[in-house]
Amino acid sequence: MVTTPATLASRVFAVDRRAAERVDVALWVRVRVQGQPEHPARIANISRTGFMAMTPCPVFDYAPVLVELPRIGWVRATMLWSLGDRIGGEFEQLMQPDDFAKLRPFFI
């Protein structure tokens, strides 16, 4: 299989984003999916690039969502995967270090 440089570069970028330091947290949030009512979720780990959460409500892969983070507010994300009640999302924008530091009280 031949990989073009552009494709390879995008894959390297994706791996770099996934490799961001993840922190275990106990963080109750609200999630909004377009066309659905708000629903609760518990974020189990978070990084400046994304999160893994549990929620009883179905969220489709690649759905755009809003996540309300305490001390930060509503943040845009894209759901990348779901497995049972677990979901994984990527923030639309890299979370700034100052904002990430606001979540420290929730670190486990």
Where are the language model's segments positioned?
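Structured alpha-helical
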Residues: 1-108
